[in-house]
Amino acid sequence: MRTIRIGSGAGYSGDRIEPAVELAEKGNINYLVFECLAERTIAIAQNAKLNDPTKGYDPLLVERFEAVLPICKKNGIKIITNMGAANPQAGAAKVREIAARLGLGKLKIAAISGDDVVEALKVSDTKILETGAPASSMASVLVSANAYVGAAPMVEALANGADVIITGRVADPSMFLAPQIHEFGWSQDDWDKIGKGTAVGHLLECGGQVTGGYYAEPGKKDVADLARLGFPIAEVSEDGAIVITKVEGSGGKVTEHTCKEQILYEVHDPKTYLTPDVTADFSQITFTEVAPNRIQVGGVTGRARTDTLKVSVGYNDGYMGEGQISYAGPGALARGQLALEIVKERLKITGVKANELRFDLIGVNSIHADVLAPAPEPTEVRVRVTGRCDSMKEAVRIGNEVETLYTNGPASGGGATKSAKQVVAMLSALFPRDKVVPVIEYLEA
């Protein structure tokens, strides 16, 4: 029975590049998938495209493709990625340019768009899930609205001979599912097989998480050679049999436990994992070690997909200003607490208008606030003050006040930093599937 091998080349936009090179060189893979598009990333990319119509794709696209494209071309590996972000056409054009510059010969590149529904949402009565308000009520602040497209357009592109597929917003598991459907000729309403293929995608989509990265905890869950963490590979057979593994000799490990942690990642209901392709059921999933770093996956089923697609909605939510400064040595905690009180009072005196303010001592209460039992007094703390404002001018003033602690006390502050930036916040909606029409464009290198 025929088997294919799919490698995960990235788990987020800024991920390491050398594990993908290792997969292409030593992984004996047929497909290399780069998942680089977090929820907020595409809204940021949309802003970049508005400022420059030739931008809006992933900032590391060029560096990644320069590293892996020659190897993939040589070894006959197809590449699928959502690094197109807000501008798949520009991303595909850049890949064509790289291929030509490197003299790689003939290459067919597919750019998949159609996920951008922001203009439709601006005049839509579609409800925002978190607020219940109609999307049209946010028209003036909307930055982006992208539907999670499924595997179908990628399957079509592969059938038409694409060597590289550059997409915008697609569901993460769908990029791994598409080659399985294409290679094995699975019907896209064979729900159990589509469910199995989706489980493959969910296990691989975060890259090194399933090979022990996110799993590692010294003394409890030790993982060797994390500095050389290998990224995962799925071996998938035509009948849906699955083995998760990694490049032999690479760092990290693939075990029942790493797979169990990853299958639960971002899953609210294991019995009803909704994707554009299927309603997958992970509730009876099994993981069995068949050899070191080789985990067999079973028990996954699927049901019919929904009539709606999730839309990730990005909107302008003001401006965030931040300032930080450190105190060390005896009395560091007391000086840090005094610094916070001074800044709090200064913001009142100077009339800074902030919708939200937060005052933290990093290393003391910035994560758990005051819910944990008191720890021994630290000998170093870092003050952090941040606030969300309606204007950049007001946001800048927050960091400025923290910086003035340098000379205005308390004693011995150092390492002050400040920043101010626009806030792009995220909401979600459900949009009719039949109103989202993917578009495929082909470029020849």
Predicted stretch roles:
Residues 1-24:
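N-terminal amphipathic/basic leader segments beginning at the initiator methionine
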Residues 1-3, 39-55, 73, 117-141:
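Gly-rich Lys/Arg/Thr-decorated short loops/hinges at beta-loop-alpha junctions or inter-strand turns
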Residues 100-117, 177-218:
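Catalytic or ion-translocation cores adjacent to nucleophile or general acid/base/metal-coordination motifs
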Residues 144-158:
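Active-site glycine-rich loop that binds ribose-phosphate moieties when present
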Residues 105-109, 210-222, 270-289, 345-362, ...:
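Flexible, glycine/charged-enriched surface loops at secondary-structure junctions
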Residues 194-299:
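A conserved active-site cap/scaffold subdomain adjacent to cofactor or substrate pockets
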Residues 27-45:
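N-terminal glycine-rich anion-binding loops that anchor highly charged ligand groups
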Residues 298-445:
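C-terminal non-catalytic interaction/assembly regions of soluble proteins
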